[in-house]
């Protein structure tokens, strides 16, 4: 509902009271025009705002004797601008047009010193930009979604839902540094909310773990360690430990590889033998590198499932493990 309507009844009574008094002739036009504006408001006529602005202009020409009429007019001008912006968004679903109207409303709220309309307009703009960001996200236009999120954060830097959504859009753009900065800022602002913190940590951990796994697959081992270390900043993950073990084995850092493979096993203790095979394979590889042949043979035996079967067999043959 428009804020103007909340003031309408009081205005109408005030105008009626003014008309019963004795006014100088030069106020007659302002009074009549004011009453016309009230009638236009009652009829939802969009010309009402122009009428009240004319009232203000006439009162400024008259001077002090018309300040009472002017003060009543300026109480509704920002509200009427807000009503237009509100209807464009909520009724007509015209996001861009509503945002343009909202910017004009903010200027009117500042001009006529109406903090309530300013606050309401900012909230309306946040709704509009949120809708815009969501639409861009659905069509995978993540760069435009980020710009919409930035517009919200320019209005309210502490709008945490937008910080989270911006992080997701940056993830979609694969902008690691910007994603990390945004998700870290979000986490700093939601301290105490365990559910949201856990959710955000998982998003960040998964992003950097997957990126680290890709670097590992591409044999970019230093990059992989950097990315996996970033992932570990956001909590423990059994698959993260597996990736660490794999990278460290390739780097021949067998102690670190064995430690991480064992951590993965410990976290995934309830997994099936097939799902444990990857940890055992990396553990066996590390143990072989450390010269712990007997332990390596046992671990590689436990790794003989699925995609690790042939590789584990090959290592056992090379180690001359008992059959």
Segments predicted by a language model, with ranges:
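N-terminal leader/linker segments that initiate helical-solenoid repeat arrays
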Residues: 2, 21-96, 100, 323
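Residue-level recognition of tetratricopeptide repeat
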Residues: 29, 62, 112, 125, ...
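Structural motif corresponding to the intra-repeat A-B loop/turn of tetratricopeptide repeats
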Residues: 43, 91-92, 132, 139, ...
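Flexible helix-coil transition and linker loops at the boundaries of alpha-helical arrays
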Residues: 59-74, 107-123, 188-201, 266-274
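Canonical tetratricopeptide repeat
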Residues: 69-72, 76, 83, 117, ...
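Terminal, low-structured helical/coil segments at or just beyond the last alpha-helical repeat
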Residues: 210-222, 274, 281-285, 289-323
